[in-house]
């Protein structure tokens, strides 16, 4: 019996050690899938960059329902993974509960704030990046009508839309902006067919540039715009390559940076908790120009958007944050 106990104890010790060695950091994605070519894929890119540079493996999990977040966070924490990174406001309550239960584990949440001493909260000034692409949309539009298709109808996505409207109006005060949301549940992040239908409706009303902030649903926006000879605007990742010459630009949100820094800081014993806000000044949000869209961006547009970036950093242009008062001035 004593020998059996020793063998079992040794096996358990080996299993725990192997788990920690092979999968120290852990990453939980938002709904929509790891390879959504948008938000989740940006997070994945940050994890892969860390893995390539540090030679450290990580584990990840792709939830398929709103109920799986807490289970995944607790599972990783209980198995010794550190840090545990969750990329979505949807996991806020789960993070609050589990992080309190594991005070010695480091946690990171993206797109939400959890006020605990072992949690880093990374939020973005999406309104600033959306303002920049809105400015470009307003300058590129020939009809004076542009569109916005959001994913799930939540305050965060209205923040994108509000920043976009402000940028469009800065370029053309008389412009008309059509806005639609794909849905009200997590399924709205992964419904490109519905997003495409909304885009076609906006195009039928005269929109010639449509901005998608809808996760994997946004692929339907870009596809529909391209199919109808109009311009799309990507989000989160640089999506210009998806339809070369048909994507005006992408509002790049550096989710990869949040994940990479979380993994790296923990490995390097440099982890700090608290809120990190990433905007234009921190290169947390920006617009994308590359070989796929450079011919769509005129020198005048470049000058205008670069001036807007400088003015935002200087504080002479203040982009209203919808989430500050649940309203949009335009």
What are these regions, as identified by a protein language model?
Residues 9-16:
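Hydrophobic helical h-region of N-terminal Sec-dependent signal peptides
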Residues 17-23:
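Sec/Tat signal peptide C-region and signal peptidase I cleavage site
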Residues 1-8:
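Bacterial N-terminal signal peptides that target proteins for export
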Residues 23-330:
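A residue-level marker of the well-folded mature domains of exported/periplasmic proteins
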């Amino acid at each position: 019996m004593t020998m059996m106990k020793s063998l079992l104890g040794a096996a358990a010790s080996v299993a725990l050690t192997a788990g920690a060695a092979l999968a120290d950091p852990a990453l939980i994605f938002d709904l929509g899938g790891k390879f959504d070519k948008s938000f989740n894929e940006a997070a994945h890119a940050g994890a892969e960059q860390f893995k390539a540079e540090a030679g450290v493996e990580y584990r990840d999990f792709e939830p398929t329902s709103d109920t799986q977040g807490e289970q995944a966070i607790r599972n990783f924490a209980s198995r010794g993974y550190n840090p545990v990174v969750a990329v979505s406001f949807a996991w806020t309550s789960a993070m609050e509960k589990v992080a309190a239960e594991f005070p010695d584990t480091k946690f990171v949440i993206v797109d939400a704030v959890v006020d605990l001493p072992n949690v880093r909260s990374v939020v973005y000034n999406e309104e600033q990046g959306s303002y920049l692409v809105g400015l470009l949309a307003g300058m590129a539009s020939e009809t004076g009508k542009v569109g916005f298709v959001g994913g799930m109808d939540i305050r965060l996505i209205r923040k994108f839309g509000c920043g976009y409207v402000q940028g469009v109006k800065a370029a053309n005060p008389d412009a008309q902006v059509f806005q639609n949301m794909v849905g009200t549940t997590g399924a709205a992040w992964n419904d490109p067919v519905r997003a495409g239908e909304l885009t076609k409706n906006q195009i039928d009303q005269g929109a010639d540039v449509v901005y998608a902030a809808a996760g994997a649903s946004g692929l339907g926006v870009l596809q529909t715009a391209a199919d109808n000879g109009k311009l799309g605007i990507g989000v989160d990742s640089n999506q210009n390559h998806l339809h070369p010459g048909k994507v005006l630009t992408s509002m790049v949100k550096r989710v990869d940076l949040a994940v990479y820094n979380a993994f790296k800081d923990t490995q390097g014993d440099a982890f700090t908790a608290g809120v990190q806000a990433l905007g234009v000044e921190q290169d947390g949000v920006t617009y994308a120009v590359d070989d796929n869209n450079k011919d769509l961006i005129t020198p005048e547009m470049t000058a205008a958007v670069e001036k807007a970036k400088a003015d935002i950093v200087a504080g002479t242009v203040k982009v209203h944050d919808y989430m500050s008062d649940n309203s949009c001035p335009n």
